[in-house]
């Protein structure tokens, strides 16, 4: 089955054609970073307008690169949740209209499950495994039983790691996007320049949860309190000290979950999965098999949406054209199909 995937949940307008869940025939991503860089963050109104402008040429390019006409497409998948409402509406409405007018099967999928599926585009990964979803809006540690069946073990109780990276980068004028900039700066800095605090939340059912509000506050508002006076307060040192603590906050509950569940395969997804220190630290655990998507599949893309959509459509699932976009995902903290 050849599936056309469409993704527009935030600030990337993307379309891809994927055959049988993992054979990528095309993968087009039009990024809006230059339009949001001056604001050090995504402006929803600008994002939705750019999606409206770009969605048709991006889809046409995806079909052309795949060497296929719309008639040769077996189904259409699009992100339906979660994300920025204005952005989601553009891609979802376009996909529904295209599917209806061409009489193609249609499925709306969960963007976060798409990120979790991204590694399947390049690897044959048996279920179950331990999933790590880390992005600007989410931090989820979960047991993955199937492509649509996950059991959430832990999540963030306040801020997501990607949001912390972005806020720290914005406060210190390090650049945009924050995650990539901090990762690059940290390579030239000393992680011992500051000893930022670890959150103490791993009690009373929070063993696998994470918290980033305290770290964010410490780096932005209380940096002198935790700074090592032997080091100069440079952007590189700030980035290195912050990133080291941010990654450690993730690793502790993740490794605990691996021990407690007995799952030795960890599959990561989401924008923060591109972080080089996170990859490096997990690679040190030789007892684990840690699988990361290629960097191009960590950021938002439509190949993961098409790949995931294939499994729903193959099973016979269909989404009615009355489906509406949703900025949030209800029940994502509970066990069950998503």
From Swiss-Prot:
Which EC class, in a word? Answer: transferase
Query: What GO terms fall under cellular component here?
Result: cytoplasm
Instruction: Quote the EC number.
Output: 2.3.1.234
Write down how the cofactor binds this protein.
Binds 1 Fe(2+) ion per subunit.
Q: Name its co-factor(s).
A: Fe(2+)
Assigned keywords, A-Z? Acyltransferase, Cytoplasm, Iron, Metal-binding, Transferase, tRNA processing
Annotated compartments = Cytoplasm
Positions that bind Fe cation: 111, 115, 300
Its main subcellular localisation, reduced to a broad class, is cytoplasm
Q: Which GO terms describe its molecular function?
A: iron ion binding; N(6)-L-threonylcarbamoyladenine synthase activity
Annotated residues for binding of substrate: 133-137, 166, 179, 183, 275
List the Pfam families hit by this protein, alphabetically: TsaD
Which reaction(s) does its UniProt entry say it catalyses? Answer: L-threonylcarbamoyladenylate + adenosine(37) in tRNA = N(6)-L-threonylcarbamoyladenosine(37) in tRNA + AMP + H(+)
Looking up InterPro entries in the UniProt record yields:
ATPase_NBD, Gcp-like_dom, KAE1/TsaD, TsaD
**Which processes are annotated in GO (biological process)?**
tRNA threonylcarbamoyladenosine modification
Record NCBIfam families: gcp_kae1 (TIGR00329), T6A_TsaD_YgjD (TIGR03723)
Q: Which PANTHER family match?
A: TRNA N6-ADENOSINE THREONYLCARBAMOYLTRANSFERASE, TRNA N6-ADENOSINE THREONYLCARBAMOYLTRANSFERASE, MITOCHONDRIAL
Function, as annotated? Required for the formation of a threonylcarbamoyl group on adenosine at position 37 (t(6)A37) in tRNAs that read codons beginning with adenine. Is involved in the transfer of the threonylcarbamoyl moiety of threonylcarbamoyl-AMP (TC-AMP) to the N6 group of A37, together with TsaE and TsaB. TsaD likely plays a direct catalytic role in this reaction.
The entry sums up its family as follows: Belongs to the KAE1 / TsaD family.
Its name, as the record gives it, is tRNA N6-adenosine threonylcarbamoyltransferase
Q: Which organism is it from?
A: Treponema denticola (strain ATCC 35405 / DSM 14222 / CIP 103919 / JCM 8153 / KCTC 15104)
The upper taxonomy is: Bacteria, Pseudomonadati, Spirochaetota, Spirochaetia, Spirochaetales
